[in-house]
Curated annotation (Swiss-Prot):
InterPro entries: EF-4 (IPR006297), EFG_III/V (IPR035647), EFG_V-like (IPR000640), G_TR_CS (IPR031157), LepA_C_sf (IPR038363), LepA_CTD (IPR013842), LepA_IV (IPR035654), P-loop_NTPase (IPR027417). GTP binds at residues 60-67, 127-131, 181-184. It catalyses: GTP + H2O = GDP + phosphate + H(+). Keywords: GTP-binding, Hydrolase, Membrane, Mitochondrion, Mitochondrion inner membrane, Nucleotide-binding, Protein biosynthesis. HAMAP family: LepA. This is Translation factor GUF1 homolog, mitochondrial. GO terms for biological process: positive regulation of translation; translation. This protein may be expected to contain an N-terminal transit peptide but none has been predicted. Residues 51-234 form the tr-type G domain. It is a peripheral membrane protein.
Length: 651
């Protein structure tokens, strides 16, 4: 029987391989029929009317194949040559290619000739990130779209971030084109995934496209579905000019390069435009579309997405979500984009304090390129001058650190992540925001009458039924409150929990992956604030408070966290000539302690026999000297040691 199953499996695999070899051939024939072997010219782009323009995005969970499918669509329409080296063409950052994830949303304009009517259509494709930390990029991209291709991995099924991005699209009334990707994989189960999509999103089975981003199978059907189901832009081509600023990045040669969508009217090279937000005036020096390289055009019309370069080089003059209009012709601003809300804060300091100006320049340029990052200067007694930066999540922070190192050569120390708390002291009437432990006085915080609120999130977790118990145990340990538990199908369970953001921001994702053997996924959304018993925990080295190691923790977790922190500190600090006490304290109450024993010099080595009192005298003298050193000595903590101590996990 076992041999029979092996033979049947080989036959199935062989048939599948032949089937997809034929689909690759059909993809090649479709490519030859639908495209020319070159990107579109400026004249061809400008000739497409608004009625034959489609703005759409590809949305999905991370690693479900968005960028790979985008590569096939670009090849199919001739935007790029068909080449085996085409991988993540729209992922231009080094960190994106190294990690295999999309961090920055990218736009590209392609021409597609629809077989059903023979007409050429201008399709503006926006490739979006899939990770929860980059939801701001997704939200910003969808604001320029009229529809979205919702991609689901046929080998994995609907995931937590699939649901999150679906509701983002639904909130904007976008037309949805459902598609199951990776159908060429032998482990793909299209019918099961289609049923999940029916249950989770209310789509019809016959509307679910079966595609392969790897082979290009049915890629032409994706384009046809976009033309058929996604409406054209609704702007007024004859109305007053209104341009939505979607993104901005800095070019070393051209200065600020703005990614824009023309909502109404026409914008031409040489026009004078003004900002609704600041009132500042600009002159349009260059505009065009991305094909995916910049293609200059003389004008951009209502509904089109492209780039614009003005006479202002400073990126800070460009505010994402701003509305631009003709100078001296004021208009009603567009709805714009909801500002990003930082969820995690970290202190960033240079390893060498002399490199602060270099770090300042690097942070300034990166924050201008990433509107979701906030940065304010901050000073630490231990680490010197640095920045308190706000991020959308830990992956977002990690990518920012990596870009600082790769693009600017900045070596940094990142403090432990904190979340934004709100504090109201006894005599105050309103709450104040607190994003850093350094903003709170040490010694007995909170004082009597002080109220503290911590941020909450509603987490959506999708896992297999046999690990539900472990996931529930993890959520309860993180002070979670269960809101809902449903079966997506017989192999998927959806859990919804209300959790403190501080518990999620630390290592929740890693613990979830560990307890579910890597199969559980989760996404979260803001759920407001709630009162909580938060305390400031200080770390003392030889009796002196080290401000860089201060943290805000829940009282119930303080002792566990304190023990772990002083244990890591003991491992990292070099031994001294005297005994060093490491303590974690809540005000004056010590909750954890470790001791680094002194290095012992053998002062009796020169004594060769004789009276024992001579040895005792030397030992007493050594002991007194160490007591004096312990009273007046300062332990110097190297910056490299801080980097190891402040990591989330213990080695």
């Amino acid at each position: 029987m076992a041999l029979r199953r092996v033979l049947v499996d080989r036959i199935v695999r062989s048939c599948a391989a032949r089937a997809f070899a034929s689909t690759s051939a059909s993809y090649a024939s479709a490519r030859d029929a639908l495209k020319e072997e070159r990107p579109p010219t400026a004249d061809e782009l400008a000739a497409i009317p608004r009625e034959r323009t489609r703005n759409f995005s590809i949305i999905a969970h991370v690693d479900h194949g968005k960028s790979t499918l985008a590569d096939r669509l670009l090849e199919l329409t001739g935007a790029i040559k068909r080449d085996g080296s085409n991988k993540q063409v729209l992922d231009t950052l080094p960190v994106e290619r190294r990690r295999g994830i999309t961090v920055k949303a990218q736009a590209v304009s392609i021409l597609h000739r629809e077989p059903s009517d023979g007409q050429a259509y201008l399709l503006n494709l926006i490739d979006t990130p899939g990770h929860a930390d980059f939801s701001f990029e997704v939200s910003r991209s969808l604001s320029a779209c009229d529809g979205a291709v919702m991609l689901v991995d046929a080998t994995q099924g609907v995931e937590a971030q699939t649901i999150a991005t679906f509701y983002l699209a639904l909130d904007r009334n976008l037309a949805i084109v459902p598609a199951a990707n990776k159908v060429d994989m032998t482990s793909a189960d299209v019918e099961r995934v289609a049923k999940q999509m029916e249950r989770a999103f209310g789509v019809e089975r016959e509307d679910v496209l079966e595609v392969s981003g790897k082979t290009g199978h049915n890629a032409e059907k994706v384009l046809s579905a976009v033309v058929k189901h996604v409406p054209h832009p609704s702007g007024d081509p004859n109305g007053p000019l209104r341009v939505l600023l979607l993104d901005c990045h800095y070019d070393d040669y051209r200065g600020a390069v703005n990614i824009v969508q023309v909502a109404d009217g026409v914008i031409r090279k040489g026009d004078k435009v003004s900002s609704c937000a600041s009132g500042q005036h600009f002159e349009v020096l260059e505009l065009g579309m991305m094909t995916p390289e910049r293609t200059k055009t003389d004008a951009m019309y209502a509904g089109q997405v492209g780039y614009m370069i003005t006479n202002v080089r400073d990126v800070r003059s460009s505010k994402v979500g701003d509305t631009l209009h003709m100078k001296n012709e004021p208009v009603e601003p567009l709805a714009g984009i909801r500002p990003a809300k930082p969820m995690v804060f970290q202190g960033l300091y240079p390893v060498n304090s002399d490199d602060f100006e270099k770090l300042k320049a690097a942070v300034s340029k990166l924050t201008l390129n990433d509107a979701s990052v906030t940065a304010q200067t901050e000073n630490s007694t231990a680490l010197g001058a640095g920045f308190r930066c706000g991020f959308l999540g830990l992956l977002h922070a990690d990518v920012f650190h990596q870009r600082l190192q790769e693009e600017f050569g900045a070596e940094i120390i990142a403090t432990a992540p904190t979340v934004p708390y709100r504090i109201k002291h006894a005599n105050d009437e309103a709450y104040i925001d607190c994003t850093s432990p350094l903003a709170i006085p040490s010694g007995g915080f909170p004082s009597k009458g002080t109220e503290i609120e911590e941020p909450l999130v509603e987490a959506t977790i999708i896992c297999q039924p046999h690990v539900v118990g472990k996931v529930v145990e993890l959520c309860m340990d993180r002070r979670g409150e269960q809101l809902e538990q449903n079966f997506l199908d017989d192999s998927r369970v959806i859990l919804r929990y209300r959790l403190p953001l501080g518990e999620v921001a630390a290592d929740f994702a890693d613990e979830l992956k560990s307890r579910s053997s890597g199969y559980a996924t989760f996404d979260y959304d803001d759920a407001g604030m709630a009162k909580s018993d938060i305390v400031r925990m200080d770390v003392l080295v030889n009796g002196s408070v080290v401000d860089a190691l201060a943290t805000l923790v829940h009282r119930s977790k303080a002792q566990r966290h304190g023990r772990d922190l002083v244990a890591r500190l003991k491992e990292a600090l070099p031994r001294q000539l005297y005994e060093v006490a490491l303590q974690a304290a809540l005000g004056s109450k010590v909750i954890a302690r470790e001791t680094i024993s002194a290095m012992r010099k053998n002062v009796t080595a020169k004594c060769y026999g004789g009276d024992i009192s001579r040895k005792k005298k030397l030992l007493e003298k050594q002991k007194e000297g160490k007591r004096r050193m312990r009273r007046i000595g300062n332990v110097d903590i190297p910056n490299e040691t801080f980097a190891g101590i402040l990591s989330n996990k213990r080695n």
